[in-house]
């Protein structure tokens, strides 16, 4: 029986050497929220704790300034 191996998750921000996550960078932030608008946890994305906190703060700021929606499930 073949064994499947799970690819190791890595923090994209650490590998790229990002100093701080900017709340105005909507393209990057959209990769870390679900279709319904929830913030994706670090155990799924592999983001380190330092950058997960910055990411959450940036997403919340962008939501407050109406750059990102709180939810996309409006009907």
Swiss-Prot record:
Keyword Membrane: no
An example molecular function term from Gene Ontology annotations: structural constituent of ribosome
InterPro entries: Ribosomal_bS18, Ribosomal_bS18_CS, Ribosomal_bS18_sf
Example GO BP: translation
Keywords, in A-Z order: Ribonucleoprotein, Ribosomal protein, RNA-binding, rRNA-binding
PROSITE patterns cross-referenced by the UniProt entry: RIBOSOMAL_S18
GO cellular component, one term: cytosolic small ribosomal subunit
Protein's UniProt keywords contain Nucleotide-binding: no
Family statement drawn from the similarity comment of this UniProt entry: Belongs to the bacterial ribosomal protein bS18 family.
Quaternary structure (record): Part of the 30S ribosomal subunit. Forms a tight heterodimer with protein bS6.
Function, in words: Binds as a heterodimer with protein bS6 to the central domain of the 16S rRNA, where it helps stabilize the platform of the 30S subunit.
Name of the molecule in the record: Small ribosomal subunit protein bS18
Gene source species: Shewanella denitrificans (strain OS217 / ATCC BAA-1090 / DSM 15013)
């Amino acid at each position: 029986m073949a064994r499947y191996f799970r690819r190791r998750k890595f923090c994209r921000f650490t590998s790229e050497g990002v100093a701080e996550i900017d709340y105005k960078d909507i393209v990057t932030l959209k990769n870390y929220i679900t279709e319904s608008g929830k913030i994706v946890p670090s155990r799924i994305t592999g983001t380190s704790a330092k950058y997960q906190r910055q990411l959450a703060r940036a997403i919340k700021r962008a939501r407050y300034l109406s750059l990102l929606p709180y939810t996309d499930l409006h009907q």
